[in-house]
Amino acid sequence: MTEKENSPWVEKYRPTSFKDIVLDPTNKEIMETILKKNYFPNLLLYGPPGTGKTTTIINLVNSFQEKHGQKNQGLMIHLNASDERGIDIIRNQINQFVNSQTLFKKGTKFVVLDEVDYMTKNAQQALKYLLRGIDGNVRFCLICNYITRIDESLQNEFMRLRFNQLPEKDIIN
């Protein structure tokens, strides 16, 4: 059996292209506008577990990179903040990635932070200060289930998009 055949159902059928993702009309329009324009804002996706936040952002970043000739895994870092919740993840991994020079790699860097609602308040503050000190070549995409656990001043640095459970008819079709 192949690796895909042994994968859990959710992984086996996870969309691998942005065009295959089912979203509510408002979020779909916003995401399509991001792809059409040459501007990718810092995004904060929030909502209940299992609503497609992570799949959407990974596919959106990949589609954006492809459209702009920047498809390179070295330009994106994807971290789960529930694994490393403290300030060290900001000081070490993220800061190092953001400030590293990319030889032979041109394009926008993307930092995707999943489960940000599990980060400590100090780590959230450090992230806010890092955001304010970077150039326009880096975009942050935060994902969380509970937006109330995210410092409001950090929220204000992002375009916020709420993800809700889709009606079953939308998922099946």
Protein language model annotation of sequence segments:
Residues 1-160, 164-170:
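P-loop/Walker A NTP-binding region and its immediately flanking N-terminal helices
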